[in-house]
Amino acid sequence: MSLDGERTIALSRRLMADGGSVVILEDVTERKAAQERIAHLARYDELTGLPNRNHFRERINEMLEIVRMRGNQIALHLIDIDRFKSVNDTLGHPIGGKLLKEVSRRLGSIVRTGDMIARFGGDEFVILQSTPSRRQDSGRLARRLVKALAVPFDVDGHRIDIGASIG
């Protein structure tokens, strides 16, 4: 129960032997927020906000079922960021983290609505291309991804050249 739209209150009522009752109100706002946060972290990467490996696994299972039922096609692009370790080693993890956020934004600007980008961890990303109409479409997307990630990034005044390996 929410009294003011901001706090969550749990109400419990116990009947007493004499016919009366005891009502207990407990503010569970923080507990509910913590549970929601844990549920979110179980499915999304904290750094980039992208779906994580668990969420990806759920989605690909759904997509494979659709493929079986309808005969659709899907394509999977496994992306490994080249030279990411040297970015972390030379510029530090905070810059590396910002670079990963920029990589995820750049990937997001390329894929179509309905496709899924997930971060598997470290410098590994996966794109689930949900409806390539022809095999050439998946190859075309892979080339666009490689080309986009070859363009240098500017992170806090640092020009960062990376690349990507896609399989």
What are these regions (language model features)?
Residues 39-43, 49-76, 82-112, 118-127, ...:
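Conserved long alpha-helical elements within nucleotide-processing catalytic cores of c-di-GMP signaling
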Residues 1-9, 19, 158-160:
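Per-ARNT-Sim (PAS) sensory domains and their PAS-associated C-terminal
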Residues 16-42:
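Sensory coupling linkers of modular signal transduction proteins
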Residues 118-119, 135-136, 149-165:
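Catalytic core regions of nucleotide second-messenger enzymes
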Residues 4, 11-14, 24, 165-167:
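PAS-family sensory domains
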Residues 18-19, 71-72, 162-163:
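Short loop/turn elements that form and flank the Walker-type P-loop nucleotide-binding site
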Residues 13-16, 151:
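Output-coupling edge of small sensory domains
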